[in-house]
C-alpha cells in the first residue's frame, strides 16, 4: 500500500491523502460471508447514547471474519485481498480445499495464490495460525487469543503487532504495541506477522465531511456548553471553565488514572506502558 496525494482543486482536497488501494484485487465481497449492518448511532438497547459522537455515515455490509482460526489441518488458498469498511485492516478471502470460504485479516506480505495453514504443524510465515507454544521467541504476531478457543482479541487493527519475547511456564510474554509487557496463556493461538495496511496511520482526512462519511459526528467542547450539560459549561462570554478539565460526569481527565487497582488482570501485566 502507498499513500496518494490529491491535487489541491478545493480546500478539502489540499491536504487530503488517500490509499492507492493497489493491494485490493476485487471490487465486491463474497456474498455468503456478508450481511446488512443496522445503524446504531451510539445507542444501546434502551436507546440511550453510550458512545458519543456517532451517527450517519455510508451504508455498510458486515464481513464475517474468522478470528478463531479453528479449521486445523486444512490448507487454504488466498483467493483475493479485499477492502473492509468496518475496520482499518484489509481482509483476505480464503478458499479451503474442502470447499469452505472464510475471511481473515490480511497480514503484511500476503498475496493472491498464497497457501495458508492452521495448526501446530504450520510453517512460521505470515497468515499462518498456531498456538504460541509453537511460535519461536522474537516472532511478530497478531490476532492473539486471551482465552484459548475464544478467538483473537488483541492486535487486530492496521499495522498492529505484538512481539513474543519469552515463555514462563504456561504463559507467554508479549510486548504490546503500547510498550506494555503482559502475560497471556501460551496455549492460545496467534497469527504470524503484522497486520497489513501499515500506512493507514499516515492518512490525512483533509476535511470534516470525510469524518461524517465514517459515521463520526463533531466533538463539542465542554466550555462551549450550558451548565446543565457539562461541569465546564456556562459563564458570561467566553470562560476557561473555572476548574481542571473533567468529563461531562465530573471525572478528571488529562492523565488521571482510572484503572481499577483490584482488576484481576493486573497480575498478568509485567511492565506497564510508559515505564522504562
From Swiss-Prot:
tRNA-binding keyword on record: no
Organism field: Lawsonia intracellularis (strain PHE/MN1-00)
Protein name: Large ribosomal subunit protein uL2
Subunit structure: Part of the 50S ribosomal subunit. Forms a bridge to the 30S subunit in the 70S ribosome.
Record GO biological process: cytoplasmic translation
One Pfam match: Ribosomal_L2
HAMAP family assigned to the protein according to its UniProt record, in alphabetical order: Ribosomal_uL2_B
Annotated region described as Disordered, given as residue ranges: 223-276
Similarity field: Belongs to the universal ribosomal protein uL2 family.
SUPFAM superfamilies linked: Nucleic acid-binding proteins, Translation proteins SH3-like domain
Keyword Ribonucleoprotein carried by entry: yes
Keywords noted in UniProt: Ribonucleoprotein, Ribosomal protein, RNA-binding, rRNA-binding
Amino acid at each position: 500500500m502507498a499513500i496518494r496525494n490529491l491535487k489541491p482543486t478545493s480546500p478539502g482536497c489540499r491536504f487530503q491523502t488517500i490509499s492507492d488501494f493497489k493491494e485490493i484485487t476485487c471490487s465486491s465481497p463474497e456474498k455468503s460471508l456478508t450481511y446488512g449492518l443496522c445503524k446504531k448511532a451510539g445507542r444501546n438497547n434502551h436507546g440511550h447514547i453510550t458512545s458519543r459522537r456517532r451517527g450517519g455515515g455510508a451504508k455498510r455490509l458486515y464481513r464475517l471474519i474468522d478470528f478463531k482460526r479453528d479449521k486445523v489441518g486444512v490448507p487454504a488458498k488466498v483467493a483475493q485481498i479485499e477492502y473492509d469498511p468496518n475496520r482499518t485492516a484489509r481482509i483476505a478471502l480464503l478458499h479451503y480445499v474442502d470447499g469452505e470460504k472464510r475471511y481473515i485479516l490480511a497480514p503484511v506480505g500476503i498475496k493472491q495464490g498464497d497457501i495458508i495453514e492452521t495448526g501446530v504443524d504450520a510453517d512460521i510465515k505470515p497468515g499462518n495460525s498456531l498456538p504460541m507454544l509453537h511460535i519461536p521467541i522474537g516472532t511478530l504476531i497478531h490476532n492473539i487469543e486471551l482465552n484459548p478457543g475464544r478467538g483473537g482479541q488483541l492486535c487486530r487493527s492496521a499495522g498492529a503487532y505484538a512481539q513474543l519475547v519469552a515463555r514462563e511456564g504456561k504463559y507467554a510474554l508479549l510486548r504490546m504495541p503500547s510498550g506494555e509487557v503482559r502475560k497471556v496463556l501460551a496455549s492460545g493461538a496467534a497469527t504470524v506477522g503484522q497486520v497489513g495496511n501499515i500506512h493507514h496511520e499516515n492518512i490525512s482526512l483533509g476535511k470534516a465531511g470525510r469524518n461524517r462519511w465514517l459515521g463520526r459526528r463533531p466533538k463539542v467542547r465542554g466550555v462551549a456548553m450550558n451548565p446543565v450539560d457539562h461541569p465546564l459549561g456556562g459563564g458570561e462570554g467566553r470562560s476557561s471553565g473555572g476548574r481542571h478539565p473533567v468529563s461531562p460526569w465530573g471525572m478528571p481527565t488529562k492523565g488521571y488514572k482510572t484503572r481499577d487497582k483490584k482488576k484481576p488482570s493486573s497480575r498478568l501485566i509485567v511492565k506497564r506502558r510508559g515505564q522504562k
